[in-house]
């Protein structure tokens, strides 16, 4: 399941983040790649331990906590602190699958990566190339969203970033461990929750159909969630 979420950040917020990121020192992104991914990764990143990365990452986390579509789709248990990357001058990231387990920064605690997220911080017309291509059961989906919009996709997916031939593609990226590990179960819960949300304004709050559907959702979540 690949889900686009509009306006996680406002245009004003994007401009503020970009002003700070554009003035920052960028490092070779290959230094943070795994052994196999290192050979296909050509981009730049902000140092994860920098005050800037941590402060901007916290801002994104606050926005995610008030984004209902993200909560519904991801059912987040743990979110890896957001990172920032930049692709320019032919920068690209070849086909790879994200690591299944990651240590949270500054701790010995591991998290499982169920979902990967890219939050776009550059408008599509600012750069050529730079599409996020995600392989799924129905073929390859190319994603290039407006600044402030975000895409969620399974971390198990083979994916790549095509070469940027003009301008710069700037984004934040991170991973989510979900309360519901199984992708099929998580998709069913998301579809059911979205149906409930669409039905809610059309019927009375005590409508038996709405009450029953809501009960089904929570009982399935109770069965499948692993807090």
Curated annotation (Swiss-Prot):
Report keywords, A-Z: Dioxygenase, Iron, Metal-binding, Oxidoreductase, Vitamin C
Instruction: Please name the InterPro entries in this protein's record.
Output: Oxoglu/Fe-dep_dioxygenase_dom, PKHD_C, PKHD_hydroxylase, Pro_4_hyd_alph, Pro_4_hyd_alph_FE2OG_OXY
Cofactor binding summary note: Binds 1 Fe(2+) ion per subunit.
EC numbers listed for it are 1.14.11.-
What does this protein need as cofactor?
Fe(2+); L-ascorbate
GO MF assignments:
2-oxoglutarate-dependent dioxygenase activity; iron ion binding; L-ascorbic acid binding
Q: Where do the annotations place 2-oxoglutarate binding?
A: 169
Protein name in the entry: PKHD-type hydroxylase Dtpsy_0528
Supply the source organism for this entry. Acidovorax ebreus (strain TPSY) (Diaphorobacter sp. (strain TPSY))
């Amino acid at each position: 399941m690949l889900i686009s979420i509009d306006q996680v950040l406002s245009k004003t917020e994007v401009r503020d983040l970009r002003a700070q990121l554009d003035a920052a020192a960028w490092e070779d992104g290959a230094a943070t790649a795994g052994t196999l991914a290192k050979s296909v990764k050509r981009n730049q990143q902000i140092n994860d331990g920098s005050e800037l990365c941590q402060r901007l990452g916290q801002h994104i986390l606050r926005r995610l906590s008030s984004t209902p579509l993200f909560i519904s789709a991801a059912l987040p248990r743990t979110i890896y602190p957001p990172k920032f990357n930049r692709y320019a001058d032919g920068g690209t990231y070849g086909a790879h699958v994200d690591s299944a387990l990651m240590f949270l920064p500054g701790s010995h605690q591991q998290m499982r990566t169920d979902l990967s997220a890219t939050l776009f911080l550059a408008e599509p017309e600012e750069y050529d190339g730079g599409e996020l291509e995600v392989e799924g059961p129905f073929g390859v989906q190319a994603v290039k969203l407006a600044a402030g919009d975000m895409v969620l996709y399974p971390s198990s997916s083979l994916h790549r970033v095509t070469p940027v031939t003009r301008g710069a593609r700037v984004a934040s990226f991170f991973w989510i461990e979900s309360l519901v590990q199984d992708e099929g179960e998580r998709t069913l819960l998301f579809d059911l929750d979205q149906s409930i949300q669409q039905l809610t304004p059309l019927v009375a709050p005590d409508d038996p159909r709405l009450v029953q559907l809501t009960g089904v959702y929570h009982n399935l979540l109770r069965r499948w969630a692993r807090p």
